[in-house]
Amino acid sequence: MTRYIFITGGVVSSLGKGLASAALGALLQARGYKVRLRKLDPYLNVDPGTMSPYQHGEVFVTDDGAETDLDLGHYERFTGVSATKADNITTGQIYKTIIEKERRGDYLGATVQVIPHVTNEIKDFVLSPAMDETGEKAVDFVLVEIGGTVGDIEGLPFFEAIRQLRQDLPRGQSCYVHLTLLPFIKTAGEMKTKPTQHSVKELRSIGIQPDILLCRCEQEIPPEEKRKIAQFCNVRPSAVIQAMDSSSIYAVPIDYHEQGLDAEVLDVFGMRDAPAPDLTRWKTIDDTVQHPDGEVTIAVVGKYTVLKDAYKSLIEALHHGGLANKVKVNLDWVESETFEGDEGAAAARLENAHAIMVPGGFGERGAEGKIRAAQFARERKVPYFGICFGMQMAVIETLRNVAGIKDASSSEFGPTERPVVGIMTEWIKGNETVQRRANDDLGGTMRLGAYDAVLTAGSKIAEIYGATEISERHRHRYEVNIGYVHLMEDAGLKLTGRSPNGVLPEIVERDDHPWFIGVQYHPELKSRPFAPHPLFASFIAAAKEHGRLV
């Protein structure tokens, strides 16, 4: 029997519902249960693929090619369960489906309304088969996070749907967890419970009585305040769970367990004889974070650096590399435009970095700065890791400054006589050929999801992976032009990874450099704290070695 846990938020956004959902999933896993996490996003976009990173943050890509919310990255990293298209839905997708059904005549002339048609689509999504990773057995728990906060007009159909689900499901098969804020007013020296009371009042006004309150706070909640919250919010005092800031995000499962979150959830389901959790691996990770053997500084040269959520998976993957090497990873965020128009700016800013990371991105803005970062890394023998756009800029840098093709560029930046990087028009997906054109819609038209690659035997990349065949996740529309590979290799940048049909360049590396690798895919999307991606583990090891040498 599958049980459902609905996680909602109140008072303000960005309290950490995604992290709380992921941590609760990890705690249930630690007790031996199978879990799957899903996200309901109330915005009207079909997916976040065309949304600005400044507004939405990172777009997390699944193996099956879904462009999803960054919270699915938290889910994967904390549970190790790979998300799919079936784990994220938006209002845009729901309305698109309903309108298509109406045009086909599926509703048999009925007036199409929010209730029941929209709410039924939401319920069907929530209740769709949730299988474990073998695909053979249903999971024990489905955790469903509702985006936004209670009271948002966009979220009303979702709250109505989960209200109905409590009645639709057998008794004792659902649980509501509400994440809220307990602000501490320093001038008054008091913790204020009124925002939480009003948030729960709003939730109850639409027919949802939370079973558990997860209260974000800066200080410990005094017992009398817990009793007050419980009384006014109609929950047991034991169901008022304190959620203070943790020393690191990987300490969150431990902290929530100590506060009794998982035990309280299981009590709601009447599962009082559940196995005790095994939190050994989380304690090991937290101990490594708290007691590193050293530090390294990684310069991250990007264009969305003012909003760190735009690089959420990348940040975590770099820290996973630190865990693998038992070092603390300090990130020096460098706006790539800083280097444009100033020859010495790159050298001055990157001088103290132990390694340089140039992550993915889109568009011409900041591109020249990334090219200069790649040049600095190549000339100074500083470890360099280019991901997606970062690989493309490394190729352009080599062809400009080593091969002497001064006008080498990307067709993404406009018409060019030397399209070293060009738009992809055709590639293989499974057994089918996918075709795209420059004037296609932007949404959902990139090369998305997991693709295989073949690595050159004896190359550094093959040594790092310990294999010559790999599968990684992609999200890109442009690719290194295969017609320039011979010039690139003559200039010292070797192509050591291709698509299985040999047409698409996937990986480049320099054999005259301690660690200089560019990959067209996004390895950060598959890294886990308890299974760091080998590329990030190797990159941080190279940074550690470079730091020792300098």
Swiss-Prot record:
Q: Please tell me where Mg(2+) binds in this chain.
A: 71, 145
Q: What class of enzyme is it?
A: ligase
Task: Note down the stretches annotated as region Amidoligase domain.
Answer: 1-271
Q: Which reaction does it catalyse?
A: UTP + L-glutamine + ATP + H2O = CTP + L-glutamate + ADP + phosphate + 2 H(+); L-glutamine + H2O = L-glutamate + NH4(+); UTP + NH4(+) + ATP = CTP + ADP + phosphate + 2 H(+)
Q: Does the keyword Metal-binding apply?
A: yes
Family affiliation: Belongs to the CTP synthase family.
Q: What's the subunit arrangement here?
A: Homotetramer.
Q: What does this protein do?
A: Catalyzes the ATP-dependent amination of UTP to CTP with either L-glutamine or ammonia as the source of nitrogen. Regulates intracellular CTP levels through interactions with the four ribonucleotide triphosphates.
Which PANTHER family did the record assign? CTP SYNTHASE (PTHR11550), CTP SYNTHASE-RELATED (PTHR11550:SF0)
User: Know the name of this protein?
Assistant: CTP synthase
Question: Which gene codes for it?
Answer: pyrG
